[in-house]
Curated annotation (Swiss-Prot):
It catalyses: AMP + ATP = 2 ADP. GO terms for cellular component: cytoplasm. GO terms for biological process: AMP salvage. This is Adenylate kinase. Keywords: ATP-binding, Cytoplasm, Kinase, Nucleotide biosynthesis, Nucleotide-binding, Transferase. It comes from the Bacteria. CDD domains: ADK (cd01428). Catalyzes the reversible transfer of the terminal phosphate group between ATP and AMP. Plays an important role in cellular energy homeostasis and in adenine nucleotide metabolism. Residues 31-61 are annotated as: NMP. InterPro entries: Adenyl_kin_sub, Adenylat/UMP-CMP_kin, Adenylat_kinase_CS, Adenylate_kinase_lid-dom, P-loop_NTPase. Pathway: Purine metabolism; AMP biosynthesis via salvage pathway; AMP from ADP: step 1/1. Pfam families: ADK, ADK_lid.
Amino acid sequence: MIRIIFLGPPGSGKGTQAHLIANKYNIPNISTGTMLRQALTRSTHKSYELHKNIMHTGDLVNDEFMVQLISTRINQNDCRNGFLLDGFPRTILQAKSMKQCKIFVNYIIEFFASDSVIIDRIAGRRIHVGSGRTYHIKFNPPRNYGLDDITGEILTTRKDDHEEAIRKRLSNYYQHTEPVLDYYREESKYKKMKYFSVDGNRDISKIYKELINIISS
């Protein structure tokens, strides 16, 4: 059973690799960002509207909301043989709540990249909302401009993919999520999971090859 967490700042390459690895090992790719955007699009409840506004400014959605969302998803049947969590947990409380909920993983993989690379990547990013598939107009373009490779549906730009929100998200990541990396480095010393750091500044194919080697080792 393969249970993986991908952590890293937005634009570090983890989203692209999450789709590739999930397809390779036939496990669900659980992207918190995609799940939130889908949930917020479907709902008119006031609490969802609040979280929608939080996302668009680059702030973090509260821990209780996120843990409930992820716990519900992981308990679905398609996760029995494994899963890949893309971008969760984002805070120490979320990480500890996972442990309390008996959600355990085999691999923690940290992606890192420079801020300049991240901003360049995100500015050109295009998203297929229905699946969460991610493209880039320069580095990873779709076969047909502006259209998803699988469905042919129109790709969109996220509302929080502007520079001010990007910098806010990076600030939140360094403040809240980097301590999570320290937490998992310590946890990995007990040999219940493996922790790896991956250079996300490189080409997609090179990163993918390294990930396959890590998971196969």
